[in-house]
């Protein structure tokens, strides 16, 4: 058997699209927190007196008059989970735990300290899909991009490397450039160096179409929010708060994609299998401040205002992608591997 392996961190493979895709996982937050907060749909920025407002409006912690502890559990359930990827249908989720400490500073004034852990995003998820393909394939897509000849035409120019990479195919900006085209990614590399180049005649390019596919993806992990708060009130009318938030990111995903290959007569000739394992780890932080004002002393009516900074992250992404060439019209290699770290 012949094998192909590359560590693309050593090459100029573009990671912009993948980087944007991975960062999109960090956007937004799940509705997690105390039972009261979740039951109210998170609309408690002006009400306060709930640990989960520690991020949305830190002044809400200033309404507490007694110290306390709070924790919440949740259940993540997804039907038709796939045992093949070791993904169970139901998982217990520890969503929130925290405490608050109150200190009286006057007859109607307090200074409070609080800490709260919550899951900002729960990544536990499974997806399975299968359908027909009308003579399309990922190999066909990579082939057509190579035939366009340049980045300006929506593709790239296929050529070999130099030195120890003289037998390796790359997609360049055009036929006069030594720079890798930004649309030449890991899958393009794997296909051009496993399936699209004839093993006996390297100058002959070709692809196999497919009439169906099977796709499975399993992902796990979460974004952990660790929030530290100081807050208080002035004469039980004005409530102020400040929160420092620390974030931890722990994501792991695995996907498997299988195409059923066919020849020009629509006869099955094997499969092409792509697997991808991806990890994202890192830390981040943000700041938030808030105020709640009770304009009428005899009324519980309150007005809340808060400001939240963006979250700054320092992330490390690793991925490992393979292709298994099990078609009859095998190309140059039977198996390919590619990894990236950024």
Q: For each predicted feature, which ranges?
A:
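Transmembrane beta-strand segments of Gram-negative outer membrane beta-barrel proteins
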Residues: 19-44, 61-79
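Short charge-dense sequence patches
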Residues: 2-7, 41-53, 238-241
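Single-residue recognition of alpha-helix boundary sites
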Residues: 12-13, 68, 247
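Asp/Glu-centered strand-loop micro-motifs enriched in Gly/Pro and often flanked by an aromatic residue
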Residues: 39-52, 83-86, 213-219
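Long, well-ordered hydrophobic secondary-structure segments characteristic of membrane-embedded
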Residues: 49-103
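Outer-membrane beta-barrel porins/channels
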Residues: 18-32, 37-38, 95, 102-342
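Bacterial Sec-dependent N-terminal signal peptides
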Residues: 1-22
């Amino acid at each position: 058997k012949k094998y192909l392996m590359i560590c693309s961190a050593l090459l100029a493979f573009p990671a912009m699209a993948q980087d944007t895709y991975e960062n999109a996982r960090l956007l937004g937050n799940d509705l997690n927190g105390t039972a009261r907060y979740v039951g109210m749909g998170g609309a408690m920025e002006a009400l306060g007196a709930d640990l989960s407002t520690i991020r949305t409006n830190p002044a809400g912690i200033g309404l507490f008059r007694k110290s306390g502890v709070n924790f919440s559990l949740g259940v993540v359930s997804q039907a038709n989970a796939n045992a093949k990827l070791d993904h169970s249908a139901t998982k217990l989720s520890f969503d929130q735990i925290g405490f608050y400490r109150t200190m009286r500073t006057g007859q109607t004034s307090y200074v409070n300290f609080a800490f709260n852990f919550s899951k900002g995003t729960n990544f536990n998820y499974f997806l399975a899909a299968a359908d027909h393909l009308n003579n399309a394939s990922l190999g066909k897509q990579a082939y057509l991009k190579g035939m366009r000849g340049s980045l300006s035409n929506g593709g790239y120019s296929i050529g070999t490397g130099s030195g120890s990479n003289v037998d390796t195919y790359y997609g360049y900006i055009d036929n006069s450039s030594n720079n890798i085209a930004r649309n030449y990614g890991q899958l393009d590399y794997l296909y051009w160096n496993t399936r699209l180049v004839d093993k006996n005649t390297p100058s002959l390019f070709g692809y196999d179409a497919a009439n169906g596919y099977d796709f499975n993806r399993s992902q796990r992990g979460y974004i952990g929010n660790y929030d530290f708060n100081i807050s208080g009130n002035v004469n039980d009318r004005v409530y102020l708060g400040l929160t420092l938030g620390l974030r931890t990111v722990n994501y792991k995903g695995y996907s498997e994609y299988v195409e059923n290959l066919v020849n020009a007569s629509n006869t099955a000739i094997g499969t092409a299998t792509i697997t991808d394992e991806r990890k994202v780890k890192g830390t981040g932080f943000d700041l938030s401040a808030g105020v709640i004002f009770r304009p009428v002393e005899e009324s519980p009516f309150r007005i809340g205002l808060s400001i939240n900074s963006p979250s700054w992250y320092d992330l490390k992404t690793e991925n490992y992608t393979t292709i298994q060439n099990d078609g009859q019209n095998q190309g140059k290699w039977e198996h390919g591997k590619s990894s990236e770290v950024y």
